From Swiss-Prot:
This is DNA-directed RNA polymerase subunit Rpo1C. Its EC number is 2.7.7.6. GO terms for biological process: DNA-templated transcription. Keywords: Cytoplasm, DNA-binding, DNA-directed RNA polymerase, Nucleotidyltransferase, Transcription, Transferase. It comes from the Archaea. Part of the RNA polymerase complex. Pfam families: RNA_pol_Rpb1_5 (PF04998). Belongs to the RNA polymerase beta' chain family. It comes from Thermococcus gammatolerans (strain DSM 15229 / JCM 11827 / EJ3). It is found in: Cytoplasm. The keyword DNA-binding applies. CDD domains: RNAP_A.
Length: 391
């Protein structure tokens, strides 16, 4: 049996990256306890790991950008262009297919259909009633959500809302609490309840247009729940209950009692970057693209998607792939000019006195040079045999 210190020395001498060394070391310690390895066996395992690592490396000169673009772009031509229902939750619409891929790579701050998947903690995840409690805390409830009927009484200058008793009970609110919340928020109006009827009277307003504006504000007023979140759906997945939300407020949902913050996620990548940081946003980009592809039955090697995510998050902020992001910020003047707005790029570069080092593919194609890709990356000079000079 080899000593742990010897294993560590052998592993750390290898050319593997630190994270792989760490993993290999832990595995070898585990196998050493189980099989009592000899030093030669440990060395053979390390050698195999190094060989596999070398095989996994990209060949020098491989045009990985072009390969990644082709590998993601070609399957995406077969994707659907519609918004579909979300993973079996018929009540919640979410953008899938090509529009979702475009949304991700364009790094849009507001996705067209933001959705959160809220996992619950040990106490709440197995009990439907407890899951409903958490959903009530999250679900955004407005007067409009609770109303069965709304009307403006022009003669008496009142806005009347007929509250649906079932919806009211489901929301966990009552008429008294609604009156209290509205009275605290709208100082310019008086509120009165008659059974399940809510009557709103403006204190000073004399114009009908002002009454309509007040009615709109009262309708949209949030009584409870998180801002930005609409309805919630509870689904049973395996043994546990999971909450899906229409709309997203990632920062606040993690603070809600009963929520498991380690597993809860949103499809809004900017929110993830703000709350959890750029590495989490990178992982979210990868996961969102992979899941969108898989929903359509398309398999793409994850390394291409990882390359896209790495480029988008390289500077510590999310950047789109396009004229306002990565392509528009290329160091090569000719590459920027070839992409779009040619004259503007050339004039601005001339004004600044920029020099193009001709390191990329586009700029070399433009001026008719061999591109620095594959064998073009190698610079060879030949030493030809010289004939001895005649006397």
């Amino acid at each position: 049996m080899v000593a742990a210190k010897t294993i560590k020395t052998l592993v750390w001498k290898s050319e593997l990256p630190d994270n792989i060394k760490e993993e290999l070391y832990n595995k070898l310690i585990e196998y050493n306890k189980k099989y009592k390895l000899k030093k030669a066996e440990v060395e053979a395992i390390i050698e195999d790991a190094v060989n596999e690592y070398r095989k996994a490396l990209v060949e020098p000169g491989e045009p990985i950008g072009t390969v990644a673009a082709q590998s993601i772009g070609e399957p995406s031509t077969q994707m659907t262009l519609n918004t579909f229902h979300y993973a079996g939750v018929a009540e919640i619409n979410v953008t899938l297919g090509l529009p979702r891929i475009i949304e991700i790579v364009d790094a849009r701050k507001n996705p067209s259909t933001p959705v959160m998947t809220v996992f619950l903690d040990e106490e709440h995840r197995y009990d439907l009633e407890k899951a409903r409690e958490v959903a009530r805390r999250i679900e955004g409830t407005t007067i409009e959500n609770l109303a069965r009927e709304m009307s403006i009484d022009i003669l008496n200058f009142e806005f009347i809302v007929e509250i649906d008793p079932e919806r009211l009970e489901k929301s966990g609110l009552d008429m008294e609490r609604i009156l209290k919340k509205l009275s605290g928020s709208f100082k310019s109006a008086e509120f009165e309840a008659e059974g399940y009827s809510l009557i709103v009277r403006p204190k000073k307003v004399t114009k009908l247009s002002d009454l309509r504006k007040l009615a709109e504000k009262v309708k949209k007023h949030r009584l409870k729940g998180l801002s930005g979140v609409g309805k919630t759906i509870i689904r049973k997945e395996g043994d546990e209950y999971v909450i899906y939300t229409e709309g997203s407020n990632f920062k606040q949902v993690l603070k809600v009692p009963g929520v498991d913050p380690t597993r809860t996620r949103t499809n809004n990548i900017w929110e993830i970057a703000d709350v959890l940081g750029i590495e989490a946003a990178r992982n979210a980009i990868i996961e969102e693209i992979v899941n969108t592809m898989r929903e359509q039955g398309l398999e793409v090697d994850i390394r291409h998607i990882m390359l896209v995510a790495d480029m988008m998050t390289l500077d510590g902020v999310i950047r789109p792939i396009g004229r306002h992001g990565i392509v528009g910020e290329k160091s090569s003047v000719l590459a920027r000019a070839a992409f779009e707005i040619t004259t503007q790029h050339l004039f601005e570069a001339a004004e600044r006195g920029e020099v193009d080092p001709l390191n990329g593919v586009v700029e070399n194609v433009l001026i008719g040079q061999p591109v620095p890709v594959g064998t073009g990356i190698v610079k060879l000079t030949m030493n030809l045999p010289l004939r001895p000079q005649r006397e």
